[in-house]
């Protein structure tokens, strides 16, 4: 079975695989059909955006473990997803490098033993720059990440630290901790993928080369660890491992994430949707780089919060934010 979002793309695929025993499905109905396939025990959620919410809920209700590579699902609907997963007895296994590192560092320890989650960030390509130096940043500059090779949107998000803001929100739901227990640490070498500090002062971290194959494989085969060829971390080659505080004044997209999560309700959805729209406009060269956090802040300031939004209200909030930014006429 294969799913394509548009009917046109599905028709094209059907013609290409006509001589194969492959069923081609389309749209949200297609995603939902794939999500609950009885043959599968684990659903890898790797779609981009809030389109992942409904299939993830359907898979959980069908008793499937979730390998989660879609931040938006927990950012916007964590209050729905995590209680449902607990009720159904299914595991939410993080695929994100940082959240996988935290998951591995926790190793089943009770929540009460966690003092702090240390969420690492590379700092992106503009680490150390002032807001004045960021005024004339072009799309090409922002698409050069120092350590990771990723898609266009997430690379821009990493440069603004909004990606780290989304990861803070995701960590709050995944690990059931208070927002103030999540500390972002800039670690330019991306060797320590994240860590957990316990109530006795011990810090347990997961280290490795910057390679997404490890967290992906770990989520797919959990609780097993399997042989994986590839470059190993050589401590003798590590010239230095450094840490800094994030600059939340220059890169205030990260601060806005903490603000949105503290407010709660539908505000994290506003943060996420406004960023998606703003990044799209920047990639289309319709707004300046520094307008990305400005648009997020403006969208948050004009929003009337809905407490405990259901899925329909989450999607309506997303649409209203898109409409608000469209109305600015960029």
Could you say what each language-model-derived stretch is?
Residues 1-330:
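Catalytic, metal-anchored helix/loop core of enzyme active sites in primary metabolism
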């Amino acid at each position: 079975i294969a799913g394509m979002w548009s009917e046109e793309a599905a028709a094209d695929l059907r013609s290409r695989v006509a001589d194969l025993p492959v069923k081609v499905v389309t749209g949200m109905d297609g995603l939902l059909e794939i999500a609950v396939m009885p043959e599968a025990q684990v659903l890898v959620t790797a779609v981009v955006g809030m389109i992942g919410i409904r299939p993830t809920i359907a898979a959980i209700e069908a008793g499937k473990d979730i390998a989660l590579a879609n931040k938006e699902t927990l950012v916007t609907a964590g209050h729905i997803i995590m209680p449902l997963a607990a009720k159904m007895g299914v595991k939410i296994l993080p695929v994100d490098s940082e959240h996988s590192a935290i998951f591995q560092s926790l190793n089943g320890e009770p929540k009460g033993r966690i003092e702090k989650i240390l969420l690492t960030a590379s700092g992106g390509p503009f680490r150390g720059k002032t807001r004045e130096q960021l005024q004339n940043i072009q799309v090409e500059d922002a698409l050069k990440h120092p350590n990771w090779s990723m898609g266009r949107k997430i690379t821009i998000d990493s440069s603004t630290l909004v990606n780290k803001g989304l990861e803070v929100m995701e960590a709050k739901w995944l690990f059931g901790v208070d927002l103030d227990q999540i500390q972002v640490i800039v670690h330019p070498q991306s060797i320590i993928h994240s860590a957990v500090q316990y109530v006795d002062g011990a810090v347990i971290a997961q280290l490795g080369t910057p390679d997404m194959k490890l967290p992906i494989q770990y989520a797919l085969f959990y609780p097993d660890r399997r042989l994986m060829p590839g470059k190993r971390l050589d401590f003798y080659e590590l010239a230095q491992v450094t840490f800094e505080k994030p600059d939340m004044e220059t890169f205030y997209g990260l601060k806005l994430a903490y603000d949105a999560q503290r407010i709660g309700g539908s505000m994290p959805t506003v943060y996420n949707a406004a960023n998606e729209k703003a990044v799209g406009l920047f990639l289309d060269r319709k707004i300046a780089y520094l307008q990305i956090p400005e648009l997020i802040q403006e969208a948050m300031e004009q929003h009337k919060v809905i407490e405990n939004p259901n899925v329909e209200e989450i999607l309506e909030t997303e649409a209203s934010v898109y409409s608000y930014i469209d109305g600015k006429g960029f």
